[in-house]
C-alpha cells in the first residue's frame, strides 16, 4: 500500500454532496459512489494512511479506510506523494501512467545529446531543460535537428549509430510540414539510408538538382519558418524526447515518421520500411537469384475480369502502409475522376518511374506521367492503382540486383539475343537519329547492340525451357545507369505486374503480353476485327457505363482482337458524338 497516498495529479477531484466523488481528466472520468469517499477526499493530500485513518476515526473504522485506499490504488487513481514538480508536468506524467517521481529520476539519470545541421538548437535545448531532461554536450547524438532530411551530415550520423547499435531520433522543425521521427533503432527498424532512398524517389526534383549540380548537402526545400512555427516543431519533438527518456521506448515513432501540416493541422504517420538490401543496414551486395518455386493457388476473387487469391479490400489492407508521399514506395493514391458519378473509377498512384530521365525537360515530362488503376468499383480501382505503383517501384534499378559482367559469347546459349526482344529492323537502326528526333520517348531506338561489348547481364527464369537465361540488366530494370554511346536498350514495363502472390503476378504479366500481342497484330497489319456484342453479356455495369457516356456526348464499343493463342483480347473504344474532333480513345485488356 502507498505510504502517502494522494490522487493522481492529472485528476480534477470534486465532491458531489450526497452522491459521491467525480474524478475528471481530459481523457477519462470516474465516479466514486458512497459517503466514505466524500469523507476521505480532503485528507488524501500526501498524508500517511495512518493519519487519514486517525482523521476519520470518529466516522468510519480504520478497516473501511484501508479497504477504500486499497481499491483506489488498485484502480490506479492514487499515487505516492511526489517531490516538488510543476503541477502541469506532474499531471502529464501521471496521465501516462508514470509516477512523477519515477519520471524525475529517469530524466536525471539519462543524458541526451543534441546535434543540429542547418537549424538553431538553442531554443530546443531550452525546452528540454524545462522538461528536466538532462543535456550533455559530448558524445554521439541522440537527437538530430535538420533543415533537410537528405543532408550529407546525416549519412555519418547513421553510420556511427549503426556501428554502435545506438538509436537516434530525427527532427525537422522547419518547413510547412514539421517532421518528428523516425526513431531509428539499429537491427529493428530501417535506417537513415532506407529513408533517404525513399526521399530521393519521392522528391525527384530535389534529387535531380543535387546530382546534376553537385550540391554538397541536400537541396533545402523547407524554407518556411517563423519563430512560432519553429516553436511548434521544437515543442512536439521535446515532448517526444522526454517521453522516450522516461519510458525507455517510443513505439509511436520507432520506425515511423509523424508529420504535422501547419496550415491544415493534418497529422499523418508514415511507415519507414526496412529495406532488406540497404547498403547501410541491410545485407548489401547482390540479392542473389533463385528459380521461382511455383505452386497452385486457390482463386477467391474472379470478378471484374481478374483472377486473384484475395479480394481487393484485402490487397489494400495488406499493402496500404506502402502509400506515403514521404516514405512510401507509392507516394499517393488519389481519385482521378471526382465526377465519375459512381460509374467511372480511376485512381492515380504517383509518377510513372518506368521512364528514365537525363535532362530537366525529360524530368518535367516524367512528372506529368502517372501510374493509374481502374475498376468497376472504387475499391477495385484503388487496388489496381496501388499494384501498378508497386509494380513500377519494384522494377527500378538500385544496385543490389543479381547481375554479372560478360560478353554475350561468354554466356553461350544461356544469353537471350537482345534483338530477339527488341525486334528493331536494320532500317530503324540506320535511321535511328532521325526517327528519335521526331518520335516520343516511348519509341526510342537505342544504339545497335555490340555482342563483343562487356555489359552486365541478369539471370531470368525461362518458364518454357525450365532453365536460367540471361538478359542485359539494362533491359530488365528501369533507370539502369548507362552512357549514351552504350545504350543498347532500355527497360519497358510491358509484361510487368504486381500480385498478391508470385503466381498471381506472373498470370497478370503474361496476360498483358497477350493483350499487347493482339493489339500489335491488329494495328500494324491494319486488319479488320469483329465487334463484340456487349448486350449479350447481360452485365448491368455496361448499361450504366453506356448511359453515363451518352450523357457526356460519347459512345463506346468493343472489338475482338483475340489471336491464335485463344485467350480473349478486347479493345474498348470510345468517341465523341457531339462534335469534332471525335477524341477517339482506346483501351485494351486480355483475360482468361
Where are the predicted features?
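Helix-coil modules at protein/domain termini and other flexible surface or pore-lining loops
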Residues: 1-5, 10, 14, 20-25, ...
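Conserved beta-strand termini and adjacent loop/short-helix elements that scaffold enzyme active sites
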Residues: 16, 136-139, 171, 194, ...
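Long, charge-rich, low-complexity alpha-helical segments
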Residues: 17-19, 25-135, 158-159, 170, ...
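E1/E1-like adenylate-forming module used to activate ubiquitin-like modifiers
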Residues: 127, 141-235, 243-249, 261-293
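Short glycine/serine/threonine/alanine-rich loop segments
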Residues: 133, 166, 554
